[in-house]
């Protein structure tokens, strides 16, 4: 039985990857921070009683900023594969916590590589390093491939740049089977709530259910290459099954503006959103509702509030400059030719399928809150 160690197992990618590897017969070890004690909802369905003798999912406390902890954990687990997915990955927040991001995302990767080397596991353990399309930042060519020069535009991206090159360095210097997956934006129903796609699907769901009047966005013209996380974790697995380690761009090759993502997400539940104005004065309005689709996917009881919003021409989407980054990344679109040719990887979800999956999940999630509110219970404040 193969043994895998996943850092960041409580995150979106870690949860999907853990489930995928368990189905393949792996013994999966996951590293989680103490602060993630109450943040295990993504893997709760995989939980196994720690008193069982033959369980194949084991969780360990750990942190990428603690080299002794990492070394001890790798020595104890003796993994065949390490998937380093843990990171402080919110770009906007990285400008506020640059030192921590450098320590965790940059030096944390070095700590894993050095632990494997010092423990004499170079021949045994293969390492996957989660790199990011944010490395390209101020893009030097379109689309971006493995050969495109990097130009990071945030503390997060700079930290990941160090992690990328130290992985390459250890591969070349010590003959490690260590590879980078340069993953472009990948989303899902369990995406972090403050990431732009999930922010949109959550807010639109609440608007449709009459629980929220409007929501605020940053740069609506930013373009991203969005795929489904379920597809992307399969690429991670395939990368470590190759005889020769290398670096791969994982992307769909299609880019979409945030504005168009909002329009597509609204359309999924029968709403037409039109944008008027430019820059910080740009606003989005619901102008039409397809009653058949809305009733099917949201519910007839919520229709009257949407019709009222259309009649009043109330804005639903507004721009708030506080969500702009100090240095913007305007266009990301990946060239997945290498991963498709060598790995045989091809995404199963297109953007429409991704949006459908996310909207269906968030409508279901917030209907629960709507029922609680109607029953007189207090619900969480989701405004940002």
PLM feature segments, named:
Residues 37, 226, 255, 318, ...:
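Short aromatic/basic micro-patch
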Residues 42, 139-143, 153-155, 161, ...:
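NAD(P)-dependent short-chain dehydrogenase/reductase
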Residues 232, 236, 250, 261, ...:
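Non-catalytic, hydrophobic alpha-helical segments
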Residues 278-282, 289, 295, 310, ...:
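Flexible, low-complexity inter-domain linkers and amphipathic docking helices that mediate domain-domain
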Residues 43, 229, 288-344, 364-365:
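Conserved C-terminal active-site "lid" loop/helix of NAD(P)H-dependent oxidoreductases
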Residues 3, 214, 245-247:
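Residue-level preference for the first positions of well-ordered beta-strands
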Residues 216-218, 249-251, 318-320:
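Solvent-exposed beta-strand sheet faces enriched in polar/charged residues
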Residues 1-188, 230, 236, 240, ...:
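N-terminal Rossmann-like NAD(P)+-binding domain of SDR-like oxidoreductases, especially those catalyzing
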